[in-house]
Amino acid sequence: NGTQSNAYRLSQKGGLNVITLPKTIDNDVAMTDICFGFDTAKSIATEAIDRLHTTATSHHRIIALELMGHSAGWLALGAGIAGGADVILIPEIHYDIHAIAEFLNNRRQSGKRFSIIAVAEGATAVGSVPDSGEEASGGKKTGKKKAEKKADPKIVTSGSQQEPVMIREPMVNRIVRELQALTGVEARMTQLGHVQRGGTPTSTDRLLCTRL
């Protein structure tokens, strides 16, 4: 988002002729079919889901993997489908935790003793408030209280003077905690973090960059 926005500002206010390339693992640059970097990140995330199947199966757990994607769910969606995730949560569609719990319980009753959930970091529950300072529709927050916050705020101390600092718990932590309570099944979470942003590019990304 920042690269394309700043390029636009330079062209409009700086009087410069600017050419930008669609580079982002989120694959969310408007008017493009695919952004380079996306396929590489998707491959890394897919491999992570493949590996999580082993421990989820052997320990009969629910495992949620948080992937990048604050406002776009392409990465979680693509990796989730390719890796065989049982549930995929993306920012574009608010999730219902009770519906998810019911689905997971039905899986166990049918003999499936584990479940994998791919979660985009920007996924939110029904009735939650985006934390970007804007409503989901793109407008400014009205200041009205909503039924649910995006994440649970906690107070911690930091620095030599022990000043209070407000931090927010990742939504994936809350998802795992609620699902464990609703299903009675041990649930764990893992965050792939910046691992998905690096590494050797896939052949698809190399070809795309060469063509560009």
Region spans (language model):
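Short glycine- and Lys/Arg-enriched binding-loop motifs that mark or flank ligand-binding interfaces
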Residues: 22, 33, 65, 69, ...
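Acidic/polar active-site rim loop that often engages polyanionic ligands
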Residues: 21-34, 57-58, 82-83
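Short beta-strand elements at the ligand-binding edges of bilobed clamshell
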Residues: 31-42, 199-206
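Short, ordered loop/turn segments at secondary-structure junctions
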Residues: 1-3, 21-28, 92-95, 121-124, ...
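C-terminal active-site/capping subdomain that shapes the small-molecule cofactor and substrate pocket
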Residues: 178-186, 191-212
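Gly/Ser-rich helix-loop-strand patches that form or flank binding pockets
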Residues: 17
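Accessory alpha-helical/coil subdomains and C-terminal extensions
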Residues: 7-9, 14, 38-59, 63-185
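Short, conserved acidic/polar surface loops in the N-terminal third of protein domains
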Residues: 5-10, 30-32
